[in-house]
Amino acid sequence: MKQQPKVSVLISFYNLAPYVDQTMQSVLAQKTDFPVEVLCADDGSDDGTIEILRAWEQKYPDTVRVFVMDRTPGANYEANERIRRMNAIRGRLFYEARGEYVCYLDGDDFYTDDRKLQKQAAVLDADTAHRYVACGHNGCYYWQSTGKTQPIEKPLRACSLTAKEYWSFLYVHTNAMMFRNVGRQGIDPYASGVQIIDNMLTFQFLPYGGVYYLPDCMFHYRQIEGSTYHRRSVYQNYILNALMLYQQKVICKGFFASGLVRTLFEYSQLFAARKDPRLTAQAQTYLGNIRTYHAGRLRRIVNYNNENVLARLWCEVENPVWFFITKVCRHFIWKPKVRALLEEARQKQEQTA
């Protein structure tokens, strides 16, 4: 008889055959005092990924389950369709998860601490008041070509943050998060229909609690030349991050001020680059391929050279006012609060040392 798992690890794959074994081994090697299930979803790979996953499923039939999406042979889906399929994969895994806690993992990344799941579950178990919906930690970039590593975020002491404080300042890669399985309480974090990419996955859970942060680097985020992330320019990544400000309103309007603070840097860079014809053209082309309502608004913001005088005047007025307000909020409201929280965490550490 299968035991009820405490943690469900949800892994998504597409044409990642060279990395499957390392990823699966890092998860199955976890040392815990509770049962763990590993759910794998593949987006119709044609490079042998599915066969490798089936072998792991046969080897660990009580732990590993594999789901495969249908895919038209040779199909080359556009960006929106690829994101939709990724949403479907992650949603399917979430609905299948039986654990009290869930962790997401990309199929080419891997855990580096065999106590990772135990450490995070211990934090959430101790939080009997359910103040935290997630426990996150630091990770390391891992360059496939050289084997070099580098922490994703600057070292930070262990601390607890409310949902708004987290969304204003902190970034934790989704692979480093352990979430409470809110689906067991009948809550569907995917019901909003928002595209679930990177940070937006974490944001789906934030309305249900804060985040406890551990400073340990416990996973490697593989950097592969030619990947989707590396094919995008820095400017295009600014645009995608800025679009999250509007997407998050669909989930919870109460986080909009935090979102303004979070995306301040991206908007300041977009605003500063508007007078560069090359960057403006790049932005318009890139945004033209993003079929969302909010992409239209962002197109107006970055299009400084619009022939419409009123549109240019609106850009000149709207952006500086918005920039000033968010900078004031960041400096006088959020930064002091976070400093106080970090100082409180430091004092507690000194008292327990």
Regions of interest found by a model, annotated:
Residues E165, Y221-E225, H230-A257, L279-Y293:
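Catalytic core of nucleotide-sugar-dependent glycosyltransferases
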